[in-house]
C-alpha cells in the first residue's frame, strides 16, 4: 500500500472550504488502484486550522498512473496561473510506503 498525505494549514474559519473541496465527488474515485480518500480536521480551539487529506493507493505504481493520467494533468493545467486562495497558509505533501497494518475489533 502507498499513501499520500497532504497537510494544509489555513486561516481560522476556513477549514470547511478545504474539507468541502476534498470531500466532493471527483475523478480520482474512478482511478484504478485507489483504496480511499480520508479528510481529517485537526482539533484546535482557535487560531490557524489544519486539514490533512490521506489518499491510499494499492501501490506506488497506481499512484504514479494517477499522477500521469490525462485527467489529473488537465486539472492542474486548469488551475495554472491562478493565485492560491488567500486563506491557504501552507501546504505540505508527503508520501509513505505502508509497512504494517494492525486490525482492531471495529466492524467484526
UniProtKB/Swiss-Prot annotation:
Reactions accelerated catalytically: heme b + 3 reduced [NADPH--hemoprotein reductase] + 3 O2 = biliverdin IXalpha + CO + Fe(2+) + 3 oxidized [NADPH--hemoprotein reductase] + 3 H2O + H(+)
Annotated InterPro entries: ABM_dom, Dimeric_a/b-barrel, Heme-degrading_MO
Record's GO cellular component terms: cytoplasm
Domain ABM: 2-95
Deletion phenotype: Neither hmoA single mutant nor the hmoA hmoB double mutant display robust and reproducible phenotypes relative to the wild-type.
Family: Belongs to the antibiotic biosynthesis monooxygenase family.
Name recorded for this polypeptide: Heme-degrading monooxygenase HmoA
Amino acid at each position: 500500500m502507498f499513501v499520500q498525505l497532504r497537510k494544509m494549514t489555513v486561516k481560522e474559519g476556513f477549514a470547511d472550504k478545504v474539507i468541502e473541496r476534498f470531500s466532493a465527488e471527483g475523478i480520482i474515485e474512478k482511478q484504478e488502484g485507489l483504496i480511499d480518500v480520508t479528510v481529517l480536521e485537526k482539533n484546535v480551539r482557535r487560531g490557524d486550522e489544519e486539514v490533512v487529506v490521506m489518499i491510499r493507493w494499492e501501490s506506488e505504481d497506481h499512484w504514479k498512473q494517477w499522477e500521469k493520467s490525462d485527467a489529473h494533468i488537465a486539472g492542474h493545467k486548469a488551475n495554472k496561473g491562478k493565485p492560491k486562495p488567500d486563506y491557504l497558509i501552507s501546504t505540505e505533501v508527503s508520501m509513505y510506503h505502508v509497512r504494517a497494518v494492525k486490525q482492531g475489533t471495529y466492524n467484526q
